[in-house]
Amino acid sequence: MAVSRLPPAALSLKQFLQRQKVLCLYRDLQRTIRRVPHESDRKYLRDWARDEFRRNKSNTDQDAIRMMISQAHNHLEELRRSLALAGC
């Protein structure tokens, strides 16, 4: 019987790719938040994003994760549109 060299907690390919999407989305969100002109708004948005991602960190349901990624993309695009309208 062949023994796997992977650690028992290794992610599947699908999980790995989904994790990369989430990390990329988080970084894009943080970069976009840096463009917000007011420091208090930036802090609020940064804390909100961090709390949302941390709260859902342990979620393993693939469908729920896909839904959350979609919602986060919508929030990111809405923030980008708002910043574009504000001229930032």
UniProtKB/Swiss-Prot annotation:
Biological process (GO), any one: mitochondrial respiratory chain complex I assembly
Alphabetically ordered keywords of this record: Mitochondrion, Transit peptide
The organism's place on the tree of life at top rank: Eukaryota
Any Gene Ontology CC annotation: mitochondrion
Chief localisation class: mitochondrion
Compartments where found: Mitochondrion
Purpose: Involved in efficient integration of the N-module into mitochondrial respiratory chain complex I.
PANTHER family assigned to the protein according to its UniProt record, in alphabetical order: LYR MOTIF-CONTAINING PROTEIN 2
Family stated for the protein in its record: Belongs to the complex I LYR family.
Protein name: LYR motif-containing protein 2
